[in-house]
Amino acid sequence: MSLEIVILAAGQGTRMRSALPKVLHPIAGDSMLGHVIHSARQLDPQRIHVVIGHGADVVRERLAADDLNFVLQDKQLGTGHATAQAVPFITADTVLILYGDVPLIEVETLQRLLKHVVPGQMGLLTVELDDPTGYGRIVRDADGKVAAIVEHKDASEAQRAITEGNTGILAVPANRLADWMSRLSNNNAQGEYYLTDVIEMAVSDGLTVATEQPHDPMEVQGANDRKQLSELERHYQLRAGRRLMAQGVTLRDPARFDVRGEVTVGRDVLIDINVILEGKVVIEDDVVIGPNCVIKDSTLRKGVVIKANSHIEGAVLGEGSDAGPFARLRPGTVLEARAHVGNFVELKNARMGEGAKAGHLTYLGDAEIGARTNIGAGTITCNYDGANKWKTVLGEDVFIGSNNSLVAPVDISAGATTAAGSTITQNVENSQLAVGRARQKNIDGWKRPEKIKKN
């Protein structure tokens, strides 16, 4: 069975009160539409058609990819009309129809739905709701078979009492879809072409409409305003937290934890409150992350400890290394095994060798730091001359005194020491002591300035 997927993403989203197209509003670091596309790709379709309308250029620019065919719906005349715009491009046997503002749909749910597309049958995803207000109702015949879907505004009182709602997600034979689209009518309360009308057509044509339901009704919840968007965000995060806990992670409070990307975790990981994981993050066994930390596009090897209020981006932390509290590791940073970065230390494009230490109040940029080297408090690598970046190289077992300025390019060789308060502008050879400061001068009889008295 070949598969193509149509994602309806043309709506304006007026209740969002935003210049941003509704489907581009974010959930967990990606747009709602981005989440739907991600799920669609896992079904291995031969093509994905995205029907766009309001903000079409912005949507196309944000999400352009080789496997996406963007189809323009000039006028928003309903879900049926939107689907019809994609029909001329479909060549597969089966079509799955999804929605760009329903981001939590699970791949496993869609796989179950697709199994119903066999000769003489199509699949419809429905949901049981305590309050189905606003949903189309699933009308069944005396034998319990689906007969039709009636939109809420067109439903009678008896039909509104039905609690089985339509999600709008369909899996249909492609050769039937074009015919059904040509037979749609806008003779309804909204004056729109409803995709749901194909259900009655399918029944009339002798097809069986087989139904599936999601395990969690939130899978099919859309977002029409920012309140609903926030509800989807929180549900996504709780679901992500449950998955991580099932893999061996302890979350101090799953309600105060966010995943905004793809996270791979080991066992016996401890994550404290208010931690945000962004992009692609790899966390190995026995890692501890303190409260109020942001980890983005980084790898934390076995036994790493990140202390409170640290920001880690584009970094690799080796086994048993630690950072923080209040550490900032910027892109290109590598801490080798058991390296230590303390409070108010910032690294950018810097490598710290095994067991190297920078305890506090330090900036290390464009630097190579050897094993067991110790960086004193207040040390700054002066790596930028206003036009170009230059590198600082420290060998193994170097001792940098407090309050040093290391003016790059400069090379301080193994075993060398620099005196506190030095400005180092020249290379230092093995085991040398470098003193780069003016000699202290004590002046006798010096008188402190006095305040000028005002009249």
Curated annotation (Swiss-Prot):
Mg(2+) binds at D101, N224. It is found in: Cytoplasm. The active site is at H360. GO terms for cellular component: cytoplasm; membrane. It holds the Pfam family Hexapep. Binds 1 Mg(2+) ion per subunit. UDP-N-acetyl-alpha-D-glucosamine binds at residues 8-11, 22, 73, 78-79, 99-101, 136, 151, 166, 224, 330, 348, 363, 374. The keyword Nucleotide-binding does not apply. GO terms for molecular function: glucosamine-1-phosphate N-acetyltransferase activity; magnesium ion binding; UDP-N-acetylglucosamine diphosphorylase activity. Gene3D superfamilies: Hexapeptide repeat proteins, Spore Coat Polysaccharide Biosynthesis Protein SpsA, Chain A. Residues 1-226 are annotated as: Pyrophosphorylase. Residues 227-247 are annotated as: Linker. Residues 248-455 are annotated as: N-acetyltransferase. Keywords: Acyltransferase, Cell shape, Cell wall biogenesis/degradation, Cytoplasm, Magnesium, Metal-binding, Multifunctional enzyme, Nucleotidyltransferase, Peptidoglycan synthesis, Repeat, Transferase. InterPro entries: Bifunctional_GlmU, GlmU-like, GlmU_C_LbH, Hexapep, MobA-like_NTP_Trfase, Nucleotide-diphossugar_trans, Trimer_LpxA-like_sf. Its EC number is 2.7.7.23, 2.3.1.157. Homotrimer. In the N-terminal section; belongs to the N-acetylglucosamine-1-phosphate uridyltransferase family. Catalyzes the last two sequential reactions in the de novo biosynthetic pathway for UDP-N-acetylglucosamine (UDP-GlcNAc). The C-terminal domain catalyzes the transfer of acetyl group from acetyl coenzyme A to glucosamine-1-phosphate (GlcN-1-P) to produce N-acetylglucosamine-1-phosphate (GlcNAc-1-P), which is converted into UDP-GlcNAc by the transfer of uridine 5-monophosphate (from uridine 5-triphosphate), a reaction catalyzed by the N-terminal domain. This is Bifunctional protein GlmU. It comes from Pseudomonas fluorescens (strain Pf0-1).
